[in-house]
Every structure is written in structure tokens, then in C-alpha cells.
Amino acid sequence: SKNLRRFFGVSGSYVDPGYGKDSTKLLFFECGYTLSKINIELKKKGLSLLACGSNNGQTLPGVVSTNTHGSAFKFGATPEMVVGIHLITGPSSQVYLERASYPVVTKKLTDELGAELVRDDALFNAALVSFGSFGIIRGLMIETRDLFLLHLSRKFRPFNEALEKAITSLDFSGFTTYFKELEDRATDRNQFPVTFTEESLY
């Protein structure tokens, strides 16, 4: 599968009118792409994966099919970024699976891929984390996000009411002063203004 390394974006008549997000962040990667190669291609476009494990030598279908997860705060494991699955189901049969509740591409694209478009939530979810038992994954359509940089910041804090609230209900309202300190440090380090928002807690 390592020779299957085509990737492309979709736009215009290839995107379902019901897809309500930014289609420039949709990318299809064939099964031979490793995460390291995907990250190189995404960086050129100013984009990043929504989730990633600690090893970037695996192929994209490998991490998705085994439910590899990262440490994103408000996002789940790698399968959650997948919105389309191109499956080889037999010697002369291919399907392109999407959720019926979340249409992304049009039949025009799947026809060009030589696959039958199937929209079914249960089938999609079954094939998503299937450990390779649902067919051969030819490629995956994924959603991405804007490129970002993570910086480690550690500080010992007492286990008080504010910390307990953050842990149990993800309410960080007791940390506004600390986040302001992080903003100031990040602004100095990066030489451009960095502002903390709820969306920053990704």
C-alpha cells in the first residue's frame, strides 16, 4: 500500500451542498500515506491534523482503524476526523462510505474514484474502527484544522475548588489570571499577540 500516495482537496461541485464547513480543510489521502508525510503536506497548506498519536510512522488507515488517540482537549481519537472511507470490498467492487447524517462529497467525486457512494451512519461507524475486517481501505477523506504550535507550560497548583471545578466540569473560569500570564509569555516568545479564548482549549 505504500505506493498509494495520492492526495487531493475537494471544492465546488465535488462538495455536497449540505456540507456546512470550510471545504478547503477537506483532504483525501490514499492508504499509503504515513502521518509524517501527511504532516509535511498539511504544513505546506497551513493545516494540521485534528488528532494524532505519538508515532508518526503509521499509515492513516492504520491509526484510524485501531482507534489511535492523541491528547487533544476537546477532540476525540483519530477516527473522529474521518468523514469519508473509500473501501475495496471485492475484486471488482468499491464503495465510498459517508454518514447519511453528515454528507460531505457528491456522486461526481465518487464516480471519478470508481466507487459506489453509500451513505449510512451504521455502516460508516462499523467500517471506521474495523481493525481491517471490513475491506481494504483505499483512502480516507479527513477534516483538518489551521496549523498550530503547542508549547509546554507546567505549574504546580494546590488542589482547590477552582482546580476541582476544572477537572470535573471543564470550567476554567477560576484560571483567568493564569491564562493571562500564559498569553503574556506566549506573546513575548512568539513576537506577535497571542490571545487565549475557549477555542484555544482544543
Regions found by a protein language model. Give the residues of each.
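Duplex nucleic acid-engaging cores and interfaces of nucleic-acid transaction enzymes
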Residues: 23
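Short secondary-structure capping/junction motifs at helix and strand boundaries
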Residues: 46-54, 93-98, 149, 194-196
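Glycine-rich N-terminal segment of FAD-binding domains in flavoprotein oxidoreductases
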Residues: 1-18, 27-32, 36-54, 67-72
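A broad, structural surface signal
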Residues: 36, 40-44, 125, 142, ...
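Extended alpha-helical targeting/anchoring segments
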Residues: 55-60, 65
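FAD-binding subdomain of flavoenzyme oxidoreductases
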Residues: 63-175, 179
